[in-house]
Design a protein with these regions (language model features):
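Interaction-mediating elements
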Residues: 20-144
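Sec-dependent signal peptide recognition
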Residues: 2-8
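Hydrophobic h-region of N-terminal signal peptides that target proteins for export
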Residues: 10-18
Length: 144
């Protein structure tokens, strides 16, 4: 048992030590990420970015002066958006079915957080309600 715990601790330390966050300039971001920022967040001022070269997960984290954060994968595709201080996630980033559902059930609310991968979309509204949709935009889960 002690060997198992020691092995587990060594593995955990190795994984944490392998995280390699390094600062990057705006011009070092993937072209796709820069185009995304310029199209969907043109009024936001860039604060800093870092490249996370963790095992199995390479991504860019971009932070704006208002605190809004966007995570991009290594190809420059957005994965997570967390808006701050009155900023909102543009509805045009989502499938029509998600926009229609949210517009019908929460017409006065905006999306302030979004997370996506190949299988699902997650959104958080200004009123705190969170939804998970499948990749086709069908609702799968809701948390208020």
């Amino acid at each position: 048992m002690k060997r198992f715990i020691a092995l587990f601790a060594a593995l955990a330390i190795a994984l944490v030590a392998s995280a390699n966050d390094r600062p990057v300039r705006y011009d070092q971001l993937p072209t796709r990420a820069k185009n995304f920022i310029e199209e969907y967040f043109p009024s936001h001022s860039f604060s800093y970015a870092k490249y996370d070269n963790s095992i199995g997960d390479n991504n860019y984290d971009v932070v704006f002066t208002d605190g809004t954060e966007i995570e991009f994968n290594r190809r420059g595709e957005w994965r997570k958006i967390n808006c701050k201080r009155g900023s909102i996630v543009p509805a045009s980033l989502f499938p029509t079915s998600i926009v229609s559902y949210l517009g019908q059930h929460h017409p006065t609310q905006n999306i302030v957080e979004a997370d996506r991968d190949a299988l699902r979309w997650e959104v958080k509204l200004t009123n705190g309600i969170e939804y998970t949709f499948d990749r086709h935009g069908q609702i799968k889960w809701m948390d208020d």
